[in-house]
Amino acid sequence: MARKLLLEKAHIEGIRYYDVYRREGGYRSVEKALKTMTPEAIVEEVKKSGLRGRGGAGFPTGMKWSFLAKPEGVPRYVVCNADESEPGTFKDRYLMEFIPHLLIEGMILASFALGCKTSYIYIRGEYWWVKEILEQAITEAKNAGWLGKNILGSGFDCELYVQPGAGAYICGEETALLESLEGKRGNPRIKPPFPAVKGLWGCPTVVNNVETIAAVVPIVNDGGDEYAKIGVGKSTGTKLMSACGNLNKPGV
């Protein structure tokens, strides 16, 4: 049987809720990162892992993170692309619906690694019930001290928000997504400049897919080298697949 990473605990009753998620080892990676690692060390682990974008392009995630511009006095942002609009695709919805705290944990790690105090999950408008699940999970995480000011006494501040789209397919493209997130019509921007230099509100921004962000959690927990041992060739780690149609057992 193939090894599971992201869905390893999906079968546990109540894993959607903070108390159960925490009991099963949730947020352990954030503790490790804030207490024993530097932001640069996290980026290096992601590079060593060989993790590639899980949204379709397959660009090396660590390399993408290293491209983020860091001008003095200018805020930076992490945006999670949860605008899952391809027909028959629902793996990201599955993660958010059943293990929302895994995505939140990954967003905290990415935000710390990239020096971002405010981050966003841009979700497909049709996923209205998933938005409610995420917002409840964010409230739970904040009440437990994983979001907000001075997390774990580290001096790191992080706020996380969920923003629904309006159902436009084009907003799955990262620059159209950013336009929509800014409250504008979701038209793609001309590139360059790329979001890493001029993204959300003209500031340096990293846009990653739900599955990509979630994969950062096992990478920080176990190390990039361990993650890189899984997979084939340059395709390291695990990959979620949406199985649907005329099947006996559709699912992820």
Kindly give the residue locations of the regions a language model identified.
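Conserved phosphate/anionic-ligand binding catalytic regions in large, soluble enzymes, centered on
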Residues: 47-68, 167-179, 183-185
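Histidine-anchored nucleotide/phosphate-binding helix
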Residues: 99-113
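Gly-rich Lys/Arg/Thr-decorated short loops/hinges at beta-loop-alpha junctions or inter-strand turns
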Residues: 21-27, 80-92, 195-200, 241-248
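Short, hydrophobic/aliphatic alpha-helical segments
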Residues: 10-11, 34-51, 154-164, 240-247
